[in-house]
Amino acid sequence: MPDRLVPATLAFRDDGTLISPEYGDIYYNVAGAFAQANYVFIAGNRLPARWQGSRTFTIVETGFGTGTNFLATWAAWRDDPARCERLHFVSFEKHPFTRDDLRRALSHIVAGTTLSEQATLLADAWPPAVPGFHRIEFEGGRVVLTLALGDARELLPKLVARADAFYLDGFAPAKNADLWSADVFRALARVAADDATFATYSSAGVVKQALVEAGFAYRKMPGLAGKFAMLVGEYAPRWRMRRHEPPRALPVAVREAIVIGAGLAGCALVERLAARGWHVTLIERHAQIASEASGNPAGVFHPLMTRDDNVASRLTRSGFLHALARWRALEHAGHTFARSTRGMIHLAESADDFVRMRDAFDALGAPADHVTLLDADAARAHLNLPVAHGGLLFPHGGAVWPAGLCAAQVAAAGERVTLRTGTEVARLERDGDTWRAIGADGATIAEAPVVVLANAGDAVRLAGLRHVALQPVRGQLTLLPPGTTAPLPCPAIGDGYAVPLDDGTLLIGATFEPDDVDPEIRDAGHLENLARIRHLLPGLVGDVPDVDTLRGRVAFRWVVADRVPLIGPLADEAQAVANARALSGAKARDLPRTAGLYGAFGFGSRGLVWASLGAELIASQLEGEPLPLERELVDAVDPARFLIRALRGRKLG
């Protein structure tokens, strides 16, 4: 069962001080939120001096609250001409404010300061109150906030990051002892960089003890506004106890990469790498980008929901929310593409299916700006069509034109991308620290220290992978001409889907035919799609022309055996097999990897949901940045997971 998030209660004392009724404590010192942020946390960590000249600098905070420490740090970064190239701020919050309450709190706190603009941007970008990591970018991606919504005791051990500074800012230890526990400090030590610093307003004995036990050295400093003392210090363990060191940037002489495959996965990678200053050669075997499954007229876009909030649910939720944020950023930058904005409804296929939806909805407790449960009457009213059962309404779900999205992402990369269409890679070769993409004629197409395979089923061949289970699945969609269907106000899915296009055409589909590689449109596929949509939405489809006159399209999804994509660094399978005995109990982090070789493929029918998140994950891995997902979700998409299972079961091929 997921841990439901309980929002914070907005409350003020008579003197205007913001308080937490849940914890019986104030949010900031009487001297003011920004005075505390600047004196205790920014100066206490010797900032901005410590981030100057760095490529990336990462701050981890234990309690986000109203975000004033983040806003003050952002302002300090903005005012520093020698600032780091990219500032990451990771913060944990068990009880996030709603967007409206955050906006009200910040309008009160920033009054009379120069931070109104940043406060507005933060509130505008505030995510829905659902568990997990939420990544928000500001300053064109140079200031990155990762909000970890949930209990820090559970989420901190799942953080993959190298922290340069810590802001220890929960409510007082006497009010919220859990956030100052030994487990929390051990989790902080696990992600601490060698020269990491910390600062906290508290000088309580339990805090000092927990710091020392976790390997931190502290010293007292005068507190703010008459407070006797605060603590600052460094990570200075007496001995090394970490099995795995925090991540570092891939050591490359030049920030150049080759991305093979210009569909949703590849184009998202181009945009994310270019945003970090990488120059990318994008290689596509077809004459234009988005020519295979990404060339469909539209694709539906929504998260899964299950009562137990399993891996697929958490991954699709993270991917859904991350993609929305990235798409809005693209649109804000002027790179527009067609997508529906009227929401999407997921209809139950049976009474039992509706019960499962209701149980999942109740378990998550998500707010209405993320999902709403509709009974059959409400679903009928929403669609203005007869339906047998209710479903889930996702107000930000819908349909997207994939090729337009791909074009927008390539355009956003600007001069940092070199596009090579009509070019097929026959093999990859590595010479020292350089990868070469070689054509059928033996000529080098491109070279770079990093290659990312985003070319669906062909990735397995190019990488020589033997322990990846991929299957082609044929999908045929049908286009019903204008005037043959009733109006549909938004995309609807269930056993099949229906998407109204701007020209009045209705897209329905799609067949699911494993191991069928026939590219030709078949009448049987049209009939199957029609039967499915007539069952899902009786009354939507009227008389249609002869089936053999209908237009459609065939594309192939590449599906992984466990229905989870393959995203991340590729394993060195030969070395792993040679050391199979030693690796029989290995975790993902223990496996040898092929230097500079990554993959983003096996997205099945969820390319729109997973492509942006997968690109952000790989870009973060390359740069040694905090990862946008919890550790077990990173492991869940690791391309080496099938190799790990083979090693454990001693079933190496």
Curated annotation (Swiss-Prot):
<protein>
    <recommendedName>
        <fullName>tRNA 5-methylaminomethyl-2-thiouridine biosynthesis bifunctional protein MnmC</fullName>
        <ecNumber>2.1.1.61</ecNumber>
        <ecNumber>1.5.-.-</ecNumber>
    </recommendedName>
</protein>
<keyword id="KW-0819">tRNA processing</keyword>
<feature type="region of interest" description="tRNA (mnm(5)s(2)U34)-methyltransferase">
    <location>
        <begin position="1"/>
        <end position="236"/>
    </location>
</feature>
<comment type="similarity">
    <text>In the N-terminal section; belongs to the methyltransferase superfamily. tRNA (mnm(5)s(2)U34)-methyltransferase family.</text>
</comment>
<dbReference type="InterPro" id="IPR047785">
    <property type="entry name" value="tRNA_MNMC2"/>
</dbReference>
<dbReference type="GO" id="GO:0005737">
    <property type="term" value="C:cytoplasm"/>
</dbReference>
<keyword id="KW-0511">Multifunctional enzyme</keyword>
<comment type="function">
    <text>Catalyzes the last two steps in the biosynthesis of 5-methylaminomethyl-2-thiouridine (mnm(5)s(2)U) at the wobble position (U34) in tRNA. Catalyzes the FAD-dependent demodification of cmnm(5)s(2)U34 to nm(5)s(2)U34, followed by the transfer of a methyl group from S-adenosyl-L-methionine to nm(5)s(2)U34, to form mnm(5)s(2)U34.</text>
</comment>
<keyword id="KW-0808">Transferase</keyword>
<feature type="region of interest" description="FAD-dependent cmnm(5)s(2)U34 oxidoreductase">
    <location>
        <begin position="260"/>
        <end position="653"/>
    </location>
</feature>
<keyword id="KW-0949">S-adenosyl-L-methionine</keyword>
<dbReference type="Pfam" id="PF05430">
    <property type="entry name" value="Methyltransf_30"/>
</dbReference>
<dbReference type="GO" id="GO:0032259">
    <property type="term" value="P:methylation"/>
</dbReference>
<dbReference type="InterPro" id="IPR036188">
    <property type="entry name" value="FAD/NAD-bd_sf"/>
</dbReference>
<keyword id="KW-0274">FAD</keyword>
<dbReference type="InterPro" id="IPR006076">
    <property type="entry name" value="FAD-dep_OxRdtase"/>
</dbReference>
<dbReference type="GO" id="GO:0050660">
    <property type="term" value="F:flavin adenine dinucleotide binding"/>
</dbReference>
<keyword id="KW-0963">Cytoplasm</keyword>
<dbReference type="GO" id="GO:0004808">
    <property type="term" value="F:tRNA (5-methylaminomethyl-2-thiouridylate)(34)-methyltransferase activity"/>
</dbReference>
<dbReference type="InterPro" id="IPR017610">
    <property type="entry name" value="tRNA_S-uridine_synth_MnmC_C"/>
</dbReference>
<dbReference type="InterPro" id="IPR008471">
    <property type="entry name" value="MnmC-like_methylTransf"/>
</dbReference>
<comment type="similarity">
    <text>In the C-terminal section; belongs to the DAO family.</text>
</comment>
<keyword id="KW-0560">Oxidoreductase</keyword>
<dbReference type="InterPro" id="IPR023032">
    <property type="entry name" value="tRNA_MAMT_biosynth_bifunc_MnmC"/>
</dbReference>
<dbReference type="InterPro" id="IPR029063">
    <property type="entry name" value="SAM-dependent_MTases_sf"/>
</dbReference>
<keyword id="KW-0489">Methyltransferase</keyword>
<dbReference type="GO" id="GO:0016645">
    <property type="term" value="F:oxidoreductase activity, acting on the CH-NH group of donors"/>
</dbReference>
<dbReference type="GO" id="GO:0002097">
    <property type="term" value="P:tRNA wobble base modification"/>
</dbReference>
<keyword id="KW-0285">Flavoprotein</keyword>
<dbReference type="Pfam" id="PF01266">
    <property type="entry name" value="DAO"/>
</dbReference>
